[in-house]
């Protein structure tokens, strides 16, 4: 094989692969493909400098990474607003004058979003959605997904977005194989797809038989007027497409399409959890714009939750960071939307009483999307005498101490109870609290079991020697974790207070304490707490009791952490002491405006009433602005806001 033969062979192999994997119309036998493929492999071994970036041999798995790098998306990957009923669909269409719009409808596959970047026709990178702006670099894994072209017939820079999925059949085969190897089953196809994308060994990724279905583009220089035209073009480049993609006009047609897709839900080889509806006209979509979270021109009309019948075998007891004992139902196992469900939440023992639930009952189990499965009903007529009463516990299942029964809640009051300690550490390190990246549930459990950490303060005593002998902890992983811990040592005071896990004291309450009392937060009185807006006696007493019991532990923690105090000298202006509602799309995020207004001493509310002083509005303000006008509330746009502050 010479260079010209090699170039032709690569083109042929890519063409045959597309015909086989994408078009489901083979152009060559397996034997013919394998012979040509092996010839290409041999040529590339002998001529490594001539190897093409889009050679099919680049799909060979086996590369193992230490970690994933981060990649910034050129265009943000937005989340979608969810709706669940025809009435919500009508309301969505009525917002922004979408009544006469043409819509593009397609299945919402239940998988993991992926952003592919192509330049000069070559696949440059692949990244997960991440936080919408920055994702993880999974390029090596994307290259072994057969339905991701390594090269496309389009030279300009373009981001192609889509969903990585696993078929129901392939998912079942994966779990059969895992069972043979005494490995735990994967939870569901969606988690399997997401988890596969994040495998450091792309040999495993190749075995999982992932598929990529595009649903949109990010950065591009295309000249089309409609989203449907963009998708036709993308699919012409060699990507998969589903046969249910429709251009629709009017609410009635959308309802018909939704019912049609719902009727074939179980027949589809891939899990779907709804129908995506978007405004087809790109100029109209651009005009509609975005909220802080979602595009206003598209929505996911979710399918109803799936209900199944199962048998309740037993009740497990979990103990949380505040000591609350939560009952969890153990089922005989039922398959719902590709997920094998064995555990269901029961919230508290009052819920068990409300359902009149007994062990060994047949029950109705419901699961919708990411919602934790729960029991919604009991088939009392099917009781056969084998049922038994569920007894309220009196002893903590984790530490053996006596429980306090408060009615709705049953609590373990032992502050050194293992379950409470571990849950507290996990909560403290979580993303919404101190955001210690890499210190997740499993690692906290492991470090606690090995007696490496026994309380929150021990997190800050960790060093390289702490991880000696622990499986899976390589130098880079340890370095990243210690760096994340070090970066958490100067949080805002409100974030630190919220991270302590004080019952009834969340982000909002913690912010009020920090903003009003600053460095006096450890020595507040009941009267001072009750003086705060929104603080009731239960919140105030909970805070004071936590400080009384845990003061020494908090002081120990403050030897490592230096919370940043908020500036208590508030800048006063026209907004000080006023109630403000923010609505519409502004030049900055709503959270930024909210923080700024609160720094002036304003209260930011989510709804307009007679007590509202100002409504700060942006584009597509909607009903809140209308209500402000009806009530005579002063409405100001962003430019007026800037002049007043």
Curated annotation (Swiss-Prot):
The broad enzyme category this protein falls into is: ligase
Which residues are responsible for catalysis?
108
Q: Which UniProt keywords apply?
A: DNA damage, DNA repair, DNA replication, Ligase, Magnesium, Manganese, Metal-binding, NAD, Zinc
The UniProt record lists the EC number as: 6.5.1.2
Q: What Gene Ontology terms describe what this protein does at the molecular function level?
A: DNA ligase (NAD+) activity; metal ion binding
Entry binding sites for Zn(2+)? 396, 399, 412, 417
* Family, similarity comment: Belongs to the NAD-dependent DNA ligase family. LigA subfamily.
User: What's the name of the protein?
Assistant: DNA ligase
Q: Which organism is it from?
A: Campylobacter fetus subsp. fetus (strain 82-40)
Taxonomic lineage per UniProt?
Bacteria, Pseudomonadati, Campylobacterota, Epsilonproteobacteria, Campylobacterales
